[in-house]
Amino acid sequence: DFISRLESIDSESLSNREKVTHGMLEFALSSNKDSLMDRSWEFGAGVSGFTGFLIDYNQQMFVPDSESADMLLKRLELYKRLFTQIADVQMIGLKNNRVATERNLLRTIDQLENYLGASLEEDPLLLVNFSPEISESFISDWKEKAKKIIDLNIRPTVLAYLEQLKSDHIPKGRSDEHSGIMWIDGGEETYLRALRKYTGHKNITVKEVHEVGLS
């Protein structure tokens, strides 16, 4: 549906900036179609979960100027909606027998508890790399604004997501004996798409791949 909607757009009517966005979307959708069909976000947890948004990503960012810093604050404001949406889609996945393994759920829970257990002053979302050209007073003011967003919007939403994982997902988490993707609804199709992606053969079957491995 997204691809057909994108194709229906008259690119000649777009501005140069919009054409760049259109091209990027076209590439992203065409190259990641199978991944989008997998809907892995419905059961992502552990290393394939979403805790990186809280723990890692901001530490990799470089803020060159005050305008970029202000845009980053706006990005942080969207985290409330992000984690609300994550909780919602994973609840949909749960209702459709698409749930993470218990092992990965416990990893996510541990990561979220550690995040929420850290003081506001030590929140990883504050660990941004600012340009030396940005004044210390500006950085201090930026961090105070960020802490308000984190305290009022992000942490309560993350806590709600954590409680959902504990109460709803853990009781239905897949055991180690059922850790493979084949054990979730739609898992066989997901596995076949992965085979096509990584082998380059459109019509390959699971049996054929296993026979290659045994030969």
Regions found by a protein language model. Give the residues of each.
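N-terminal maturation segment of proteins
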Residues: 1-215
